[in-house]
Amino acid sequence: MSYNCCSRNFSSRSFGGYLYYPGSYPSSLVYSTALCSPSTCQLRSSLYRDCQKTCWEPASCQKSCYRPRTSILCCPCQTTCSGSLGFRSSSCRSQGYGSRCCYSLGNGSSGFRFLKYGGCGFPSLSYGSRFCYPNYLASGAWQSSCYRPICGSRFYQFTC
């Protein structure tokens, strides 16, 4: 499987397992070591574990993709987070290339944290989502109105 992002083609064979997010997911992932125009980022594409040259941006995003080392979630650009994400919009405000959001790590800690590269931790204080931080993505069900990826399911092709 291959897809185009940032005007380049990447193959899943080069990166091992992959994670697919359905188009209904309301937020965005940013996972890139190369800046690119949001218009060149492909929605509904697969993101690969350890991939260093992919990006996922909302259609309304007018900023460049960022350069995170690990896959992270980011809030919509130039706006507050959607209420559908499970927390008040005041909990997450766009701050240039960084966002301030609720987050929860696998060790049980939670709260507000500023994440680099425009990343926004997934709202999890009330919904119990977790990160395999600093590795990969969520390690358990995201109990929000969005979607519930489970390790070992067809959405996860690798072990968190």
From Swiss-Prot:
Keywords, comma-separated and alphabetical: Keratin, Repeat
Could you name the Gene Ontology cellular component terms for this entry? Answer: cytosol; intermediate filament
Q: What's the superkingdom here?
A: Eukaryota
**Any Pfam family matching the protein:** PMG
User: Region annotation 4 X 10 AA approximate repeats: residue ranges?
Assistant: 41-86
InterPro entries in UniProt? KRTAP_PMG (IPR007951)
What are the sequence repeat spans here?
41-50, 51-60, 61-70, 77-86
Tell me the protein family, please.
Answer: Belongs to the PMG family.
Oligomeric state and interaction partners are given as:
Interacts with hair keratins.
Q: What's the stated role of this polypeptide? A: In the hair cortex, hair keratin intermediate filaments are embedded in an interfilamentous matrix, consisting of hair keratin-associated proteins (KRTAP), which are essential for the formation of a rigid and resistant hair shaft through their extensive disulfide bond cross-linking with abundant cysteine residues of hair keratins. The matrix proteins include the high-sulfur and high-glycine-tyrosine keratins.
Name recorded for this polypeptide: Keratin-associated protein 13-4
